[in-house]
Amino acid sequence: MTEIKDNNNLSAGPDTAGMTLDVIEIQKLLPHRYPFLLIDKIVELNGEESGIALKNVTMNEPFFQGHFPGRPVMPGVLLIEAMAQTAGAIVLEHHSENAGKLVFFMSIDKARFRKPVVPGDSVYFHVKLLQKRPPVWKYWAEAHVDGKKVAEAEIGAMLIDEKAAG
């Protein structure tokens, strides 16, 4: 599988190369809100080809109340969801014709969790386009803490009209 080692191997797209998005701009793209918006900022956006989002994990996260008392660990499924949110924001930001559309998470393949994510960690979600057949996109995604890979997965998503979603 394609491993994302650093920012130098991420190819630039035509419209959004070098862009960043703050949480307010992310909320204009994604329907997610607290406590389920799991990315704080897009720190690098290279068209639809790739991007990097940031999540600063704090002890105040609601999921730490039960996962696990006395030894808080961010659930792996939420790392995957944050990867999917990163990819979704990239697709929606890159294509102006996607206004009024939602990104639905379709698939997870090759998921691996390598190290726990704990309060105080800054998690960087790197995503890179593998395949595009609109309305379906596939991305390779990795989560990194302190420059080390903590999780990875191949994720698939589909764009649908917001009105069709019900």
Regions found by a protein language model. Name each.
Residues 33-74:
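Catalytic strand-loop segment that frames the active site of acyl-thioester-processing enzymes
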Residues 132, 136-138, 142-166:
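Mixed-charge, glycine-accented linear interaction segment located at domain edges/termini
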Residues 42, 108-146:
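Hydrophobic beta-sheet segments that form the core/acyl-binding groove
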Residues 37, 48-52, 122-124, 136-138, ...:
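Intrinsic-disorder/low-complexity, polar/charged segments enriched in Ser/Thr/Lys/Arg/Asp/Glu/Gln
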Residues 27, 70, 113-115:
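Beta-strand-rich interaction surfaces with strong enrichment in secreted/lumenal proteins
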Residues 2-3, 11-20, 87-124, 150-152, ...:
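Hydrophobic beta-strand-centered segment that forms part of the acyl-chain substrate-binding groove
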Residues 49, 74-98:
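Active-site helix/loop of acyl-thioester processing domains in fatty-acid/polyketide metabolism
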Residues 1-38, 44:
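N-terminal leader/capping segments at the start of a protein or of a new domain
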